[in-house]
Amino acid sequence: MDDPSFLTGRSTFAKRRRARRMNVCKCGAIMHNNKDCKSSSISSHKLDRLRFVKEGRVALTGETPVYRTWVKWVETEYHIYIVETSDDED
């Protein structure tokens, strides 16, 4: 991910190439990119994972760090909008 030039395209080819490079499945899974994936929607568990990534994630030893552009791309591609609510409403 040293070369961010592949993030700029909006064509179908660019989206497929981006998904291949980032290992993002059509179902929104972060860790796999299966062509025959049978999942169709993003679960609340995956939304929680994305929220955790967005709020801050520490890369452990031997782990690939998660970049903000990647999180933004996943949110945009799968129409995920995390609404911040305050718990102080009375």
UniProtKB/Swiss-Prot annotation:
Annotated region (Basic), positions in chain: 15-18
Keywords of this entry: Host-virus interaction, Inhibition of host innate immune response by virus, RNA-binding, Suppressor of RNA silencing, Viral immunoevasion
One GO process term, biological-process aspect: symbiont-mediated suppression of host innate immune response
Record flagged with keyword RNA-binding: yes
GO molecular function ontology, one term from the record: RNA binding
Keyword flag RNA-binding: yes
UniProt similarity note: Belongs to the carlaviruses nucleic acid-binding protein family.
Function of the molecule: Suppressor of viral-induced RNA silencing. The potential mechanism of action is based on sequestering siRNAs.
Protein name as catalogued: RNA silencing suppressor
Gene, per the UniProt record: ORF5
